Design a protein with these regions (language model features):
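Helix-loop-strand module that forms the ligand-binding subsite of alpha/beta enzymes
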Residues: 48-131
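Glycine-rich phosphate/pyrophosphate-binding loop and the adjoining helix
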Residues: 22, 26, 131-194
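N-terminal beta1-alpha1 ligand-phosphate binding loop
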Residues: 1-37, 166, 170
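Hydrophobic/aromatic beta-strand patches that form the interior of the parallel beta-sheet core
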Residues: 4-6, 32-34, 61, 101-103, ...
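N-terminal beta-loop-helix "entrance" segment that forms/cooperates
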Residues: 32-55
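Generic recognition of short, well-ordered alpha-helical segments
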Residues: 16-20, 45, 73-77, 156
Length: 194
């Protein structure tokens, strides 16, 4: 499986978490890392080049900090410009069958992203617009990787999160349907029945 990680951090050099993730992913087999904000500091996106990169990979990872309950501005612009009508949707199926994974860092702690928490909603609820975008372009939206509390994380916690992210995005059973099929097969192989 060929994995593409598009990194949308507007100031990657000052980042602690996303920069550590990039370092880890750049040495991970079958992973291509593209730093989109560094590629397009002027905001002029090379749409054919971006479409070609997407087409050449099976699993598409969108890595970014969580900004105002959404994505950084260039990621929104990138989606608007790259997922063109007739190519990604509206009769176009260039991304059909590919897998979509979000890799997100948040400043707030995990317990703030739930009913009753100070952010009021779960991360799953905040990601609905991206999930629907993934659905529209016929990709399979897989479980996201979310690292909460980046603001207060220690260097050891950040490095651990980088290793966990690499394991997450390269997991061949990240797709819940594949994981379920493997579980059922293992049960059958062991003679277990429910």
């Amino acid at each position: 499986m060929k994995i593409l990680v598009n990194v949308f951090h507007p100031d990657l050099e000052k980042s602690t978490v996303n920069k550590a993730w990039v370092r880890q992913l750049e040495k991970t087999a079958n992973v291509t890392v593209r730093k989109i904000c560094q590629r397009y500091p002027d905001g002029k996106i090379d749409v054919p080049a971006e479409q070609e990169a997407l087409s050449a990979h099976d699993r598409l990872v969108f890595q970014h900090p969580f900004y105002w309950y959404s994505v950084p501005p260039l990621m929104k612009q990138w989606i608007d410009e790259v997922f063109t009508y007739g190519w990604a949707y509206g009769g176009g199926d260039a991304l059909a069958g590919k897998e979509w994974v979000c890799a997100i860092s948040t400043g707030g702690p995990a317990d703030s992203y739930q009913a009753g928490g100070y952010n009021s909603y779960s991360m799953s609820e905040f990601l609905k617009p991206l999930q629907q975008t993934a659905n529209l372009v016929q990709t399979k939206f897989l479980p996201p990787f979310v690292f909460h509390g980046a603001v207060h994380a220690t260097e050891a916690e950040i490095e651990q999160s980088a290793r966990e992210l690499a394991a997450h995005i390269t997991d061949p059973l990240l797709d819940p349907q594949k994981k379920l099929a493997a579980l059922v097969q293992a049960m059958n192989d062991e003679g277990v029945s429910l």
